[in-house]
Amino acid sequence: CADKAYKHVYVTEGRIEFGCENADSFELARQMQKEMAYLSDRDKKQTVLVLNLANPVHPGGGVRRGARAQEEDLCRKSSLLLSLESSAARKYYDYNSSLHTYFGSDALMITPQVEIIRDEKGNLLQDSVIVSVMSCAAPMLCNGLEGITDAQYRDMMFGRITGMLKTAAYLGYQVLVLGAFGCGAFRNDAHIVSDIF
C-alpha cells in the first residue's frame, strides 16, 4: 500500500474478513488486541498473531547492527529478540543455514507470548500488550531465482504461505496481522505475494 495509492479496504467473505492497512504491524496488533477485549470471555484469551518477516539464518536479522527492516523493528519494540536468540530457536536457523540456498525453508516458529513495550515511534508504552508472533522467512531473491522457473517459485511461495495460514488455524488463531512477505529487501514481487495470500 503506497501512501498515495492507499485505500482502506476490508472484505468479508463468509466468516473471513480481511483488509489492507498501511500500518505498523505491532500498532495494528495492539489496536486489534484492544478491540478483542470487547468480545466474549471465551475469545478474550485469544491473542493476535503477528507475522515476523524473518531472516532465515540470522536471529533478528540485522537488529544488532542497526538495520531497519520489519523484523528488526519488531525486535526493537518488544521481547521478540529474546525468543529468536534462544537455544530452542537455534534449530530453525541451523536448519535454514544447512540448505545452502537463499530460498530458506517452509520452517516457521511461533512465539506465543511477545510483550510489545514500544509504540511505532519508539516511545515506551504505558501499558504493554501481549501478542503471539509467527516467524517465517520468504525466499531471498537478491540473486534471482537461482535456476528455478517462475512456476516453481510460485509453488514454493504458495506452499510457504499456505503453511503459515494452516499453522495459525491449527493453533486456533483467529486474528492475524500479516505483512508484505518478502517484498522489501528480499525482493519478492508484491503482486505475486498478494495474489497468493
Which stretches of residues belong to each language-model region?
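Macrodomain-like recognition of ADP-ribose-binding/processing modules
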Residues: 1-197
